[in-house]
């Protein structure tokens, strides 16, 4: 096993990773609420934890990776009613779109993708245990709430004391609650809501609260105590704090050993929001940029750092990824098995073992590319392809990538080939001024030509 230190939000420090069961890792990541297209913030969660999943496997661990799907909540109900469709029709469609976006970004499908609606019995069972222990109560409005002040460890993940917590922080104040900080476990049904949003329970018809869904699904699939729980930094409080209160309150055991949170995504140094008009879906971004460029851009930043999205940064990522593919285009690595005793691989593994430090790890890839360009080393090409593969990068044929870069206004491959043929004809007629004009025209359109021995001409997008 490669040594691994991971920043644990719960401990507020990097810690050596020691799995509960030697050689095996059980990991849960909070997934999407499926009522709309995934945005660039979702893309970061997908890619970051796919990177973690891939590296854990490369480091020799047997990984069970669970990422849930929230397919019932207020926003989903509201959107389905607005659209005049069933909840199932809405969520099935957006689950498909989510899978398409994830596949485009090179994300390996998790081992389990539990849907909240399939685990309502487990949620009711957990709520019953909490009520039996005096940690939950049914309020006068019919909701079942968690009594926050009765759980001694509340606030240990976020570092918030009960005195410091503001009533209503992402939790609406409700007169029926015994305490403003209490949160809902079971929402009583309203007459105006569609029948498919309601389940029977001993507390009356209703549906689960957001937080209980993840507690029940993670414990059902990974056990009451597992290794890693991840998600975006925005979920640290209250969602993950509430998960701890629910899961540990119900089981009496530690819930998760290590909590990971990826940083926020900003758009041109501003918070991403629909009101600011800087809200981008993955699909919108992929109209302008190759999906591997987007993945490269996300991994170029450390997962805990803020990620600033801008066209300039995406363009820079495209040029950088092009450099790596260009180094591989004339090589025949003959496989991509990594020699982990080789110095570049050791540096790469050290970086990844230091809290998944992808910026340092990726600098090793550029060192290898420089060596390939300098020496033509097949061994270096094999290392470059193999190490990049552990990040889900450089897995395509180099010529396919170099000729397929996204460009909204650029010429098509057919148009490029016609211009190359015209240039070749001009050279044959010794009309070098016309040949130079065509080369300049293509270069202005972002197409770089490279003349090869024997008269062939290769091209790539700049």
Swiss-Prot record:
ATP binds at residue 274. It catalyses: tRNA(Cys) + L-cysteine + ATP = L-cysteinyl-tRNA(Cys) + AMP + diphosphate. Its EC number is 6.1.1.16. This is Cysteine--tRNA ligase. Its main location: cytoplasm. Coiled coil: none annotated. A motif ('HIGH' region) lies at residues 32-42. It is an enzyme of class 6 (ligase). One of its GO terms (cellular component) is cytosol. Pfam families: CysS_C, DALR_2, tRNA-synt_1e. A motif ('KMSKS' region) lies at residues 271-275.
